[in-house]
């Protein structure tokens, strides 16, 4: 079992305003369009949008293996600047996922990152590796993050029609 990096960040330039990009990344109901791993999300516990404390259910599936779900909680909702959520629970540890936007000469610099605040239990890591057949989770996450940002970029730069 290869040890996973505790943090990683990827970025992309987007020819759209930070507010436009924020609207895309903070609409968790669209995450299935962007992410190769997160297949669908919906707000739960009465939440209707991205505000700190709001929770949503995320259904994930790697390229191989079964699907799984979790219930992240929004920790930052700063329009045009940052959207972040925490995924945590018994045995699975805690990971904070962030999308940061900053104005750039081409529109917006968008970065996606994760930080493992508390690692999952070794047994959970082993089981995840076996079920998903992913030997290098760090490389897999990095590739998925880059694909996610590219899909968001394409959506942000495509005129609504």
Spans of features found by a protein language model:
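Beta-strand/loop substructures that line and gate deep hydrophobic ligand-binding cavities in soluble
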Residues: 89-143, 152-154
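Hydrophobic pocket/interface hotspot
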Residues: 20-25, 31, 56-58, 74, ...
């Amino acid at each position: 079992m290869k040890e996973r990096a505790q943090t990683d960040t990827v970025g992309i330039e987007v020819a759209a305003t930070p507010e436009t990009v924020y609207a895309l990344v903070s609409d968790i109901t669209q995450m299935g369009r962007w992410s190769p791993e997160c297949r669908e999300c919906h707000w739960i516990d009465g939440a209707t949008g991205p505000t700190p404390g709001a929770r949503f259910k995320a259904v994930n599936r790697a390229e191989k293996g079964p699907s799984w779900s979790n219930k992240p909680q929004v920790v930052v909702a700063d329009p045009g600047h940052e959207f972040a959520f925490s995924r945590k629970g018994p045995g699975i540890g805690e990971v904070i996922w962030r999308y940061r936007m900053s104005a750039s000469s081409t529109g917006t610099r968008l970065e996606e990152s994760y930080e493992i605040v508390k690692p999952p239990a070794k047994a959970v890591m082993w089981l995840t590796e076996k079920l998903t057949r992913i030997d290098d989770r760090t490389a897999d996450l990095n590739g998925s993050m880059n694909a996610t940002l590219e899909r968001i970029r394409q959506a942000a730069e495509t005129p609504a029609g």
